[in-house]
Amino acid sequence: MSKIQVEVSFTDELESIRVDGKEMEIPKAIKTKPVEEWFEPTVGRVRWGGLGAEIKEMDFSNEKNAVYSFLFIGPEDKKQEFMACVERFCLGEEAQQGTKKENEQDYLHNAQNYQQAGNAEMAFQQYMVAARDYGRPEAQFEVAQCYQNGTGVEKSEENAVVWYKKAAEQSDAKAQCALGACYYQALGVEKDDKEARRWYEAAATQGNATAQYMTGRLYAALSYNEAAVKWYTKAAEQECPEAQYELGKCYETGDGVGEDKAKAAELYRKAAVQGYAEAQKKLGDCYSHGIGVAKDLEQAFEWYRKAAKQGNAKAQNNLGIFYTDGVGVTKDPVQAVEWYERAAEQGLAEAQHNLGFCYKNGCGVEENYEKAVKWYRKAAEQKYAKAQFVLGKCYYYGDGVEIDYEEAVKWLRKAAEQGIANAQDLLGDCYYYGYGVETNNWMAAAWYEKAAKQGNEYAQYSLGRCYENGIGKRMDCAEAVKWYEKAAEGGNADAQRELGYCYYCGKGVKKDLKQAFECYRKSAEQGNATAQRNLAIFYKNGYGVTQNKEEAVKWNQKAAEQGNAEAQNSLGCCYKWGEGVEKDLGKAIEWYRKSADNGNELAQYNLGLCYEHGDGVTKDLGKAAEWYRKSAEQGYAVAQYKLGRCYDYGDGIEHDCQKAVEWYRKSVEQGCAMAQCDLGNCYKQGRGVEKNLEKAVEWYRKSAEQGYNRGQFCLAGCFENGEGVPKDKEKALQWYKKAADQGFGGAEWAINNMQSSGIGSALEFGAAMAAVGVLEKLERLGKIFKG
């Protein structure tokens, strides 16, 4: 018995009739008639044998007992009217029964045929008849699919849910799984994990692998790990790659099952060989870190590559890292950038950060700070802490953007609050120096401490400084030493240097020059210029090490070449006096000048001396005064004294006794004995100041009590002659002897004069010479007398 499909389409009138896919010619007059009149024959100009006869005329099967299956596409009321007429006019009782029994299967069959032929609209209509009129759950599922995907009908997730539910309530596992997905993903209904789990579990108990996997996920979300493992296992046994992957994670971490990393790797492999990208990436992790398998970077690279080619962003990023570092593959920065870009374009923050690094450092791509900032910003806006830190640094240093300390603080704070130690350290600097925020030593110390406790050596050093100097912390040198030691152990050269200073001074630790030397040496060997300079001092003076002036020169040279002004000055002294190196006044001047140009007041003073005496340069008192002034204006007491003498005697500068006194005063305020003596001379002789012998004695005494031989000599003269003090030969002799003991030649002459007699005129001459500071003449006179 053959089955013949009759398809009738109706809108406002009869549109078409197809018999086994062949369209019937319908007179226009028939199309507009009521449904019942389609079945009646028409005579006259319009030839129409009635629908039943016309169908049979198109039936080429020649079977008397052919069964006709009718599909009416149109309004429901017209359909019911049509089907009633079919039973009345077209078919016998036996055929009608066959249609009722077999039509629902025919609709499904026809729908599948239309689907295969690519006629989505006709497929939907056929499924709809089977679903609506016959309640077939598989058809209801297909109708829901059509609504969900907009296939053959306007997309409607709400309608999809209606039909999934009809099928699900008839225990259709696929529909139950799909309905669970709707509740889980809020497709056509409000999100409801409880309902999702109910329908997933209903499908899962029927053996639906996808539902078993999703049931496992929902239980895992509730931390019901044992239940999750149960359902993952069932799905994994059906080779569901997603379930194998999730079950692998459970075995790796021991969630809901005993930890078994080898089992985890095995499950990742099963999912990976099925092409599941997440599992391929995870298997790459296993080989990269030796998780459950022997570490094999080449295998790791291969699995990352497989996942990366499928678009897995994390695998693409890891592939970039492997190409960057030459791990598991030949180093190729260009390839690295390519993979970072793919992952970054997908929005992976870590890859965006890595791509920023490539642009900032010119790795595999032309250096471009602006592009670096662009990618750092994208990652930072996703709250990727490392990128927030680097973006903060860019604003702090002006890399790719204008320096903006407030913006720097904003990003550094975000990273610091996520625990990035480097960000905490730099944020501490911002609070310490007042960059982008108000200066706050307490906050600076607090951020240093957070970073220091994470092992950040720079913060440990800074925290040590806080404790040493009472910055945001109570002063505690022992605590300072503790943090310096931690930083020094991490190789921080600044901390090693400061620790050396603590051992040198005995701050927070017992004084120990050998330990100080070792700390300075470690720091110096790392290139710390200050430590190199200090190490030179230790070698020069034999502090904690055998004295070695050649080594002193070596370390001064290293520091000097780094621009350390103190070392440059010291190196100049070494060359001037031939200490540890052959005497070379030309090189002495060279290093003095470098140091002086760097603002070192001692070098400026020394350069002034060289110009005053013509050592290594043409004697030039004007230039001498110029360099003395530079040093004096920086507060160097001896240079202030020297500049005072230049004004006092008009050496290289216009004679001005008042300015001389002004500079002597600046110098004596710092306790300079030579200036005290010369200020005494000014008071004694009334140069630049009103004559006052008592004041003169006061300043001579200050100078003398510091052990300055010329001050002692002048004070002795006052006692001998009763100038500003009562005449006192014994005190005069006492101070002359002190001056003589320190090699002041005029003092020897004065002592012998007092102990003999008749040389008063010579004494008066010597005292006069002392008053104007002509020491060399007094010394010469002393030697003559002694001879």
Feature roles, as predicted:
Residues 114, 133-136, 149-151, 169-172, ...:
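Short helix-capping/linker turns of helical repeat alpha-solenoids
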Residues 268, 628, 730-745, 752, ...:
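TPR/TPR-like (Sel1-like) alpha-helical repeat modules
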Residues 35-71:
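Acidic, low-complexity, intrinsically disordered interaction modules
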